[in-house]
Each structure stands twice: as C-alpha cells, then as structure tokens.
Amino acid sequence: MFEYSRRIQFYETDLMRIVHHSNYLRFFEEARVAWAVQRQLIDWRDPHSAAAFAVLGTEVRHLLPCRFGDTIKIQVQARLTGVRVVFEYKMWKKKQLVSEGRTEHVNLGPDLKLQRPTPELKQCMEKEQWNETWLLNL
C-alpha cells in the first residue's frame, strides 16, 4: 500500500479554521503523483509526463475536519480496468479516518485522443494489490 504524508498549511484552511473542501482533491492528486513518480510512470524533470492522465471523475467523502498544522497520511490503491485507471484514497489524521476518495483517469496523447495504457503502466498495475471493499463510505 502506497502512503504519502504532508502537513496542512494555513492557506489551505477557511474561515471556519478547517481545511477547505476543495483541497482534498488536491491532496489526493499530490498522493497520486507521488505514487506515479515512485513507480517511474511520471518523470519530475518532464512536466508533460504527468499530463497524460486525464481526469474522468472524482468522488470525495469528508468524514472529519483537518486543521492547520495537522499531519495527514494518504493511502493509495490503483487498478487498471480496460483503458481506465481507478485510484482510491484514504486520508488519515493520526489514527482517525478523515476522508475517502476515488478518481478515474484515462491516458491521452498530445492530440488529446484516447490512448491505450502503455506497456509500462500495464506492467506496473499487474503488481498493484486491490481490495474491492477498501472504501467504506463511498
């Protein structure tokens, strides 16, 4: 299971002093990019390498608030279904589950046309473990 940690910054909070809801998808994206970099599917030196994964859909369930200074841990699981890549996320603050999410992506070429998954992506996904009942709240 891939894990990504980060600390909540002040600018990510709102007038209620909690993380604004729009930031959860950003946190999930950070975790997804870190996952892909670790697996050498994205190259930090080539920003265009990350552009291939177009977002088809997103879902987020907010369970508990996060605040400035909290350290969060995001767990990521991924699978390939045909031409779609599905990512699921669990965000934790200490031992409390604060959010769950799912994003769905497809691979696009420079002309923005749908492409089949690359051999590298297929090989990577064959190694990934997937738990069908992992998300409890979506």
Per-region residue spans from a language model:
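Terminal targeting signals and extreme-terminal segments of soluble enzymes
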Residues: 1-73, 79-138
